């Protein structure tokens, strides 16, 4: 990330801090902001609505694109909430246990409607009822994005609907300890519902840490994640049992990561904003990652996973995956290995169409790298 990119990213972060803490920024600082560059970075981090509200809070009238982004965020959240109510009503009717996840719950902790933008809604449900849920979603006008996933099915419908229906919280490859395989045992039923469940606050936070860790160690995770940590801890920290949380995160090897995220969030969103060098580096890393991570970071992770020692080795292993990879992403190949052949051509087709730009970008980054970067992984 360039120095200019870091500066604009920090401008975005300071505006988020301003509106969340209700602490106005100095006029001379506000005068030097570049609204166009700021808007681009905010879109990258899915923070245009929050920063629009921050600009207004600081008595700056944003132009039309900012106001439109805020209005879209509010509208989309309302549409997703209404649609989620219909989906969960069906799950109740069919006696299927379920649990809304992540952002659909976290957004309620933010001080203003639409402040936390939503790209999708995630719902964990009884995996044995996958066919029933699939039939319902298709009848409701949804189509699958790609093939059925190993741990979730992503359903899309115009104009803005995106629901990830989770069979598990993580794939087996991501949950190497098997900790989240017994998630249902940790859930508590919501009083006014028969089949809706929730985590305790402690287990919600543990999942929040694990989800952030997955992205942070992969392609990266954006600044919105830090805002989520601050918002959750601001509401819940005093009542949380951190002895239990730390003990559980030790099992996952994530206790140090949780401490870093908690300290960074609390120090960044404090009155004096004093961060250690490690915390400053974490903020810069998140500012460079965007909402869903950064492709260069993801390539580094993939290179390690593939144990590729050269550009050629990386590309060959990406183009011709192992059988373990096929079993992981296309579960039907476990019992029917011959399906690798049609799935291979299906994957090539997607690489050339749906994922064309992403794959071209990946190839460009690979070709720019020198061989030493792969050997130094």
Tell where the protein language model's regions lie, with residue ranges.
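Conserved NTP-donor binding/palm subdomain of two-metal-ion nucleotidyltransferases/polymerases, i.e.
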Residues: 1-119, 125-377
